[in-house]
Structure formats: C-alpha cells, structure tokens
Design a protein with these regions (language model features):
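Active-site acidic/histidine proton-transfer and metal-coordination neighborhood
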Residues: 67, 83-185
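Active-site beta-loop-alpha junctions enriched in small/polar residues
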Residues: 16-20, 44-46, 78-80, 118-120, ...
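Gly/Pro-rich active-site loop or hairpin
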Residues: 124, 164-168, 172, 194-265, ...
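N-terminal pre-domain/capping segments
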Residues: 1-77, 81-102, 292
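Acidic (Asp/Glu)-rich catalytic clusters
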Residues: 5-8, 29-36, 54-74, 101-109, ...
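Short, electropositive alpha-helical surface patch
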Residues: 89-102, 125-138, 167-176, 204-211, ...
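Conserved, mostly hydrophobic/aromatic
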Residues: 31, 76, 94, 105, ...
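Non-cysteine beta-strand/loop elements that form the S-adenosyl-L-methionine
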Residues: 37-42, 71-75, 184-190, 219-231
Length: 292
C-alpha cells in the first residue's frame, strides 16, 4: 500500500546528525547528504555536564532552514541525566542539563527534546526513584509555557540494571508521577523496546507493541521514533543498534511500524552504525519501506 495514496500523513525519515563546527553549516549539510526529512542533534556533549551557549547565527540559520524546508528538528539531551539517581549531585546536574537542552531546543526551533528515563540507583525502590523524578522533573515541565517550547520526550531504555522504564507498561507509572503533563510525550526506540523484551517480529509483533504503548499512555503521545535495528536477540537487555534490516528485528517490522494509526506523521530518526554512507543507506531503506 502506498501510504501517500491512503491519505495517511507520511512519516518523515531522517537521522541524528553531527553538529561540531556548526549546527547549520555542518549539521544540515550532513542531513542533506542523507536526504533526511527530519533531524536530531546534540546541543551539548552527550557524555558530559557542560551547558554551552549556542551560536546565534548558526541557531537562526538552522531554525530558518528547518522551517523553510519543513524539516522537523529534535534535540537529544545528554546521556548522564538521571532523575532517579541516589546521588544528589547527579540529580542537581540532571536538572541543569535538561533545562539547558530544553532552552536550546526552543532557541533552534526543535519540536521535542529526548531524554532517557533513567534508573533507580543505589539499590532503591522504583517508587522512591519515581518520587524523585516527580519532584525534579515536574517543575521543568511547568516551565514550558511558551508557544515555541519543545515537548519533553521520554525514551525508554533496553532494560539494563534498575531501569525505571523499559517495557511499554513502565510508561504508566512514569506518566502518573508527572501528572500526564501536557508537554510530555514518548520517543520509541525500536532497538531498546526489542531488547527490553517486546518481540517486534512476525505478522503482528510491531502492531501489538504499539497497541500496548497507546493503551498505557493514550493517543497522541507518541511524538518521535528512533528507528534502529538490534545486534542482539529480543529480550537481551543490550543497547546495541544495527543498520535497518541487518539485525534481529529485520525489515518487515519497520514497514509495519509505518502502517499503525499511532505512528501517522510521526518522524523516524535513525541512530545506526556506519558513518554517512551507512546512514544514507538506512534513510533510503526506510523511505522505500514507507513508499512501496
């Protein structure tokens, strides 16, 4: 079925792009080389706590180009952020880091900021960690009062260690802890959800998983998809991305992904191995699965 003929809003396909040297000059040049219809960027070192100011010229050029070409843009917040940490310093740094990503997201015209849902460290109960999530994350969500503020998109993890959110139903308590805030959304990573134990293969694997997600968080909350194949088998709890169709998920579930009602118009971002050539091939592969 050609989705464009069925009147369904098409899924823009793109990738995470490098921006060192210039958000617009480097990031969007790379995106164009991928023939990307959507982009994701870091606005800080993903493995650090630094909160650098933007370059206003690059910000403006990036925002204007994305607007002119109808390219939805997203920010991925740093990996170190964990509101469930038992270390006070980590929680405080997480607040500052995420506040920075949200502010930078607004400055560059991003539609959403993706953050990992974190884990309950120090052997503590999940409920204790979720109380902490509420205490520190809810005020940040309440600060998102401008028309051009990005959504905060929660990305579940592959289920390693004391993960707060890895299966679809784990989003329930997480959303509850945050009063199902209107600025809250979900970023579904296909590799993570597969690694956490949701089998996306077979004729209905992907659709069943998406049904479960919608049952948990409600309609309209799925705002972004990280389209990644998996190097490991289902339920392996390992976060190792693979190129589309090459891993244990395979091509068919990605085709199925783009026919589910919950994903209509939702952008797909690849975070796969292989540098620019591998990325361009993955973008092309997903577009073919979408359009044929």
């Amino acid at each position: 079925v050609n989705n464009q003929l069925s009147g369904r809003p098409r899924n823009p396909v793109g990738g995470h792009v490098p921006v060192a040297g210039g958000l617009h000059s480097v990031g969007l040049t790379y995106a164009r080389d991928l023939k990307a219809e959507t982009v994701q960027v870091f606005v800080a070192n993903p493995r650090g706590w630094a909160t650098p100011a933007g370059n206003p010229k690059q910000d403006e050029a990036f925002r204007a180009a994305c607007e002119a070409e109808s390219i939805p843009a997203y920010v991925h917040a740093p990996y170190l952020i964990n509101f469930g940490s038992h270390t006070e310093a980590t929680v405080e740094r997480s607040v500052e880091s995420l506040r920075h990503s949200l502010r930078r997201g607004r400055e560059i015209g991003a539609l959403g900021v993706v953050v990992h849902t974190g884990s309950a460290t120090g052997g503590r109960e999940r409920s204790v960690a979720l109380k902490q999530v509420r205490e520190h994350l809810l005020p940040l969500l309440d600060e998102l009062t401008h028309d051009d503020d990005p959504y905060l998109l929660l990305e579940s993890t592959a289920g390693q260690g004391a993960s707060l959110c890895s299966r679809t139903w784990d989003f329930g308590p997480y959303f509850e802890a945050l009063d199902a805030h209107p600025m809250l959304g979900v970023c579904l990573d296909t590799c993570h959800i597969f690694a956490a134990g949701h089998d996306l293969t077979g004729p209905s694997g992907m659709h069943q998983t998406l049904d479960l997600l919608v049952d948990t968080v409600g309609e309209g909350r799925l705002k972004l998809i990280h389209a990644n194949d998996s190097k490991d088998v289902v339920g392996a709890h390992k976060d190792r991305h693979e190129n589309i169709g090459v891993g244990h998920i395979g091509e068919d579930p990605f085709r199925a992904l783009m026919t589910h009602p919950a994903t209509a118009g939702v952008p797909l971002i690849i975070e796969t191995p292989g540098g620019k050539e591998g990325h361009a091939a993955d973008v092309e592969r997903l577009k073919k699965l979408r359009d044929c």
